[in-house]
Each structure stands twice: as structure tokens, then as C-alpha cells.
Amino acid sequence: SLDRRQRQMCIRDSIYSHGWMIVRQDYSLIYNLNKLLRNMKKIFLIALFALLPFSLNAESNLDKILSSGVLKVGTTGDWDPMTMKDPATNKYKGFDIDVMNELAKDMGVKVEFVPAEWKTIVSGITSERYDISTSVTKTPKRAEVAGFTDTYYKYGTVPLVLKKNLKKFPTWNSLNNSNVTIATTLGTSQEEKAKEFFPKSKLNSVEAPARDFQEVLAGRADGNITSSTEANKLVIKYPQLAIVPDGEKNPAFLAMMVPKGDNKWNSYVNDWIKNKKSSGFFTKLLAKYNLKSL
């Protein structure tokens, strides 16, 4: 009947009408999503370009050093024979000091040694207090925020104890005991290694200018670990100390720290190290300080 056809047409028109509204809503949603994505893309590009001037146009430390005529070097002054500070004169001496003096001389600039502590030596690089550090051990933790030059010296790690306690502590493992106290110096690579080698032992961390081996000498710790380089010097200076005769562990590499991402400055120092190795400079310097790289 006519009424039936009219009802069908009304239903059809209603479906078309609602369908068009749904389609319009879908198109509106898609349009708004596209608009949102375009805005997000603009924000991302603005942020990216805001960073580009620093990354592309930032002045390299090499340019700053040559312009100012001064090479700023961060050093702790407490690592015999690498860097030692004479409290009477406030002057530095040692293997690292000779290296930095030679670098400054070859660059035609003056060297300025900036006092640093092991616990903050990395932050001195990141905060640009100095352009480069004297020798530090390459570690993954330090490499997260600082750059490293090529290495020029390799050493092992050894424990030190009182000579009278050698029979009690003849091996590395004998020091890994809950009744044993191991001294460490805050911020050093040895602090990290002590946690790895002696998980059962109690750790006594001291802050520079105090040193871990001094805790052993004073009887407040049973032992400490240090580089074979420093250990060989300490047992001569302090005959009451002895190296645990169990062999060296954890060969480590020394390098200078530089600002991370400053490839121009890092490459310059690496080329300098390479040339100095070829010329025999490092070989002569190692002999001067009775050092032997592994």
C-alpha cells in the first residue's frame, strides 16, 4: 500500500541521514587526528631546530684553548706516580703532569691545573670546569657522560693488606668475607671494582683527601684494592704494606677525559697521542717513572 511505501521511504531516508552523519563524524575525527599529528610534527621540528645551533655551531674546546692560550686540566694530585701535588708549593708533578705539559707546549699554550676530586672529576668535564682530565680508568659508567681519548697505559688491579696479615689474606678470595672490611676511595674505579670482587665484605668508603690505603695502615680496614702502578709505589713508601700474592685482576686502560661529543678536540688529542707514541715520548716517560704497561 501507499502507507507501506511511505514508511519504507522514511526508513531509507532515515538510514541515509544517520549514515551521512556517521560518515561526517568519521571524517571529522580523521580530520582532527591529522590536524593533531601536523601540530605535533611542527612542535617536534621546532624542538629539533632549537637544538641544532648548539650541536652544529658549538665552539670546540680546541678553538677555545687556542683562542684563550690556556689549556685547563683537571687533576686530583693524589695518585702516585701519575699526579701528585706538593702541599708546600702547591705544584703538581708526575707522569700525567709531564704529559699535559708536553701537550700544552706542542699546542703553543699555557697549562692551568684545576684541582679535582675523584668523586667529582667527571662532573668537572661535563660542567666545563676544565678542557681535559689527567689519566682516569675507562669505565662504562664514566663513558655515559664523558668522552675518552685513546689509551696509552694498561694496568692490573691488586689488593693491599698489612704485611703481618699476609698469611691471613693470601688470596683475593680470602678477602671476600663478611668479617672483612675493604676500604675504598669515593669516586674511583676501584670503588666499583671492590663491590664486584668482594660482595660479601663490608665496604668502608672514604672521601679524598683521605685515601683507602690509609685506612689499612690505621687498622680500620683489612685491605684495599688499587692499580698495580700505585701498589708498587706504596709498598716501597710504606714497608708495612704488602701486595696479596695472588696475581693481578681486571686489566684496565688509562685515558684522558674530554667533553662528550666534542669530536674535533678528541681527534686532535688522539692524533697527538699517536704521534707521541711513534716518537718514543711515552716509552721514555714510562721509564722515567719506572712504569711498565701491561
Model features per residue range: what roles?
Residues 1-14:
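Single conserved hydrophobic/aromatic residue that forms the stacking wall/gate
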Residues 59-136, 144:
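Extracytoplasmic small-molecule ligand-binding "clamshell" domains
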Residues 60, 189-203, 243-245, 273-294:
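Ligand-binding clefts/hinges and TM-proximal coupling segments of bilobed small-molecule sensing domains
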Residues 62, 163-180:
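Flexible hinge/capping segments at coil-to-helix
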Residues 69-75, 93, 172-187:
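Short loop->beta-strand "edge-of-pocket" segments that line small-molecule binding or catalytic clefts
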Residues 77, 154-161, 228, 232-274, ...:
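Periplasmic-binding protein-like
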Residues 97-98, 112-123, 204-218, 252:
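Short helix-initiation/N-cap motifs at beta->coil->alpha
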Residues 119-123, 136-144, 192-196, 214-250:
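A ligand-binding cleft/hinge motif common to bilobed small-molecule-binding domains
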